[in-house]
Amino acid sequence: MKIVLLVVGKTDSKLMVQATEEYIRRLSHYVSFEVEVIPDVRLGSKLSSEQQKDAEGREILARLRPSDSTVLLDERGREYSSMEFSAFLQKKMLIGTRRMVFVIGGPYGFSPAVQEAVTDRISLSRMTFSHQMIRLFFTEQVYRAMTILNHEPYHHE
């Protein structure tokens, strides 16, 4: 299975980039994982928040394939423990999911079109974090899930 983290806007923090890249490197042992960045539409534009969400939504939908299993990372999504998340990923692998796409939206969330197109939502926390931090936290959780599934001593209950 290939896992894609589709994100709106680039990360400008070198520390976040380095830490995220370290987990991506570690993940290469278990699963194909890539981060795909959609350019931030707000730079130099005078779009309203709704117009910005719609523009980002069109870019998100253009990158999704009909066969993808797509999950929005959304504060209103279902919360999982690390063990539950690893079971969620394992189930997707066992049913033969070829490409799983997790989407981090822009600062105003997801457009109605994206919300209608995708049924699965996961919340990493009810707290608010920067999109840069969520990339790191999510990548670490995928790595943690892979170590759980492979019975390796990274996660402790």
Curated annotation (Swiss-Prot):
Q: Which residues bind S-adenosyl-L-methionine?
A: 73, 105, 124-129
The EC number of this protein is: 2.1.1.177
Q: Does the keyword rRNA processing apply?
A: yes
Q: Tell me, what's a Pfam family for it?
A: SPOUT_MTase
Q: Which UniProt keywords apply?
A: Cytoplasm, Methyltransferase, rRNA processing, S-adenosyl-L-methionine, Transferase
Choose one Gene Ontology CC annotation of this protein and give it.
Answer: cytoplasm
Name the chain's protein: Ribosomal RNA large subunit methyltransferase H
Cross-referenced InterPro entries: Alpha/beta_knot_MTases (IPR029028), RlmH-like (IPR003742), tRNA_m1G_MTases_N (IPR029026)
Give the main localization category. Answer: cytoplasm
Q: What does this protein do?
A: Specifically methylates the pseudouridine at position 1915 (m3Psi1915) in 23S rRNA.
